[in-house]
Curated annotation (Swiss-Prot):
Residues 4-97 bind DNA. This is Putative B3 domain-containing protein Os10g0158600. InterPro entries: B3_DNA-bd, DNA-bd_pseudobarrel_sf. One of its GO terms (cellular component) is nucleus. It holds the Pfam family B3. Residues 106-138 have a biased composition (Polar residues). It comes from Oryza sativa subsp. japonica (Rice). GO terms for molecular function: DNA binding. The keyword Transcription applies. It is found in: Nucleus. Gene3D superfamilies: DNA-binding pseudobarrel domain (2.40.330.10). Residues 105-151 are annotated as: Disordered. Keywords: DNA-binding, Nucleus, Transcription, Transcription regulation.
Amino acid sequence: MSSVVFASARLNATNQSYLPVPITLATAYEMQHGDSLRLKTSHGLKIKIRIKEAASTLYMTTGWKEFAEATGLETGETILFRMSSRSKARVMLLNRQCLIRCPVKTPSTTSSDKNRSLSPSDQLTRASTSAHPSTSKSIPPLRNGTGSTKRSIADTSFCHQLKLTAEN
């Protein structure tokens, strides 16, 4: 098939280790048990997923959990697939409010944190407080050593290196 196909899936509690292949993708590319699919984000993350069939349904199995963990996918979030071939899909992640978000793996430091994902604002707070041991509410100096405490949106965004482009 030469045309691009789009599909989406919402992550729920039952599909964190595997994800049913959206019917649109399965039928458009005649996917079957044993196929491989390479998922790629706009940030360069590439993970190979294996397709398996169970009870007449195709599932993304081996590699899916790794992809979900690497991108920080949480229950209620949506993944959009843009497939232009049978074995490759570009993906975009949407948070619970259906806003595009960067695939950011949440760092965890203790065993209790491993089961809990932080929101981007919590990650920003944790990153800024751990980078500056002061108990005051001041903003730590920029990395360029100017000592300036002025910040731009780009400085505080996890997606500051993301370049949006229109694809034809």
